[in-house]
Amino acid sequence: MSDMINIRETGYNFTTILKRLEAATSRLEDLVESGHKPLPNMHRPSRDSNSQTHNISFNIGTPTAPTVSTGSPAVASLHDQVAAAISPRNRSLTSTSAVEAVPASISAYDEFCSKYLSKYMELSKKIGGLIAEQSEHVEKAFNLLRQVLSVALKAQKPDMDSPELLEFLKPIQSELLTITNIRDEHRTAPEFNQLSTVMSGISILGWVTVEPTPLSFMSEMKDSSQFYANRVMKEFKGKDDLQIEWVRSYLTLLTELITYVKTHFKTGLTWSTKQDAVPLKTALANLSASKTQAPSSGDSANGGLPPPPPPPPPSNDFWKDSNEPAPADNKGDMGAVFAEINKGEGITSGLRKVDKSEMTHKNPNLRKTGPTPGPKPKIKSSAPSKPAETAPVKPPRIELENTKWFVENQVDNHSIVLDSVELNHSVQIFGCSNCTIIIKGKLNTVSMSNCKRTSVVVDTLVAAFDIAKCSNFGCQVMNHVPMIVIDQCDGGSIYLSKSSLSSEVVTSKSTSLNINVPNEEGDYAERAVPEQIKHKVNEKGELVSEIVRHE
């Protein structure tokens, strides 16, 4: 009875171990085949149910392979091959044939995207519309950045102005341009501030071209995005928590990207310095070949690409002379018709008297020959009209003359940063449209005039910030400004910091102005600037004025 139990237990153990050995053998064969070095005389164990029972024992606590106490050639051969396969020499062979390990910087980037980019994408899809459409290109841009990081680790560093580098970064630039176009094409959309938040911050991906301190550039791009993000949070505070969560997820995405670059690429993009590093041109060719290999096989399997569509049919105007004048509209102007009718008797003043020789009822011969054709009207050869004179477009300008900075005639430029200002410097901003200007440091004064949809971010001013004849402007004070003077402006928002609450704001001939004051929660409370003033003369004959408030 005990022998039967021993046989059953031994058979059960043998079956279990046999399955394990079979799985290990199959795995080793796959690894060796991937390295094109198959193991000799490798045979899978037989699954014959009539094979005799063998006693297999293990040495618990030791790293050695299982021992087989049997005389079966098949199992003994299997044991020898498995033991040889897991030896240190063959383990090194297997490791070299396996897939290369992912570099630490790439692995960290994947973790960053899965944690922060996926959160932003999830919220964008919940909101939908233009925000979701723009987010798809943001995701593509971040995926292309991973490709740039991977290729740079294998390629030699090119010249910063080389055509290979421009071609290398062209896909990312294309996505950034698409993100900008989505925002510019929907200026009147309700989501304009959200689209501007993403557009202003996505230029942060340009850090790969900045050396040796990309972190300062990235911080500037995040500050540009923060300006519009504050607008979004102010607009939807207490109304739509999803919008608040969305804009915070995007700011977190930018912040964590700065942290990632600070950890792995503090001095700029890292290129390969190994002996086996290839030129960037070769790396791009290999990348293109790997991309086109998979689609080409799929196309051949499906019978190739479909033939091109036939050309469009020829136009009906193909045979017409281009110099032939266009026929006049037969419908005419109904307004002119009614004007002629309203002339009354004067409508016949332009008619001439018909001679008797031209009357058909008195001259029967005219009925046979038909009416005499009148003279052809002469076509007036009008000289080409002179195009309307347009105002000359002045060239953009950003330069320092003595102690004065000039930022003039900038259009759709959201990357203007003045970070080398001094205490005696002043900045004059003129004729800019749809721009964001960041002024870092402490300086004397800033003046902005004749600008549209232009936002200015300043740190500290000694004197004042003058704004004149601007529309839809923005001004954000990061530290302290003693006085802000606004004259003849239509639409504007001023964001004060906690250290600039004592600033004086003087307004004249201006409408639709708002001053945003920070609160304890980190958001802004909007305060409208009064526009109506009531005047009256008192008993002493003096004019007394007071603000009209609408509660």
From Swiss-Prot:
GO CC aspect terms: cell septum; cytoplasm; division septum; growing cell tip
Biological-process GO terms, alphabetical: actin filament organization; adenylate cyclase-activating glucose-activated G protein-coupled receptor signaling pathway; cAMP-mediated signaling; negative regulation of cell growth; negative regulation of conjugation with cellular fusion
Biased composition range(s): Pro residues: 305-315
Regions of compositional bias (Basic and acidic residues) in chain numbering: 352-361
Keyword annotations from UniProtKB, A to Z: Phosphoprotein
Chain positions covered by the region annotation Disordered: 34-55, 288-333, 348-395
Physiological role: The N-terminal domain binds to adenylyl cyclase, thereby enabling adenylyl cyclase to be activated by upstream regulatory signals, such as Ras. The C-terminal domain is required for normal cellular morphology and growth control.
Name of the protein in its database record: Adenylyl cyclase-associated protein
Organism from which the protein derives: Schizosaccharomyces pombe (strain 972 / ATCC 24843)
Gene for this chain: cap1
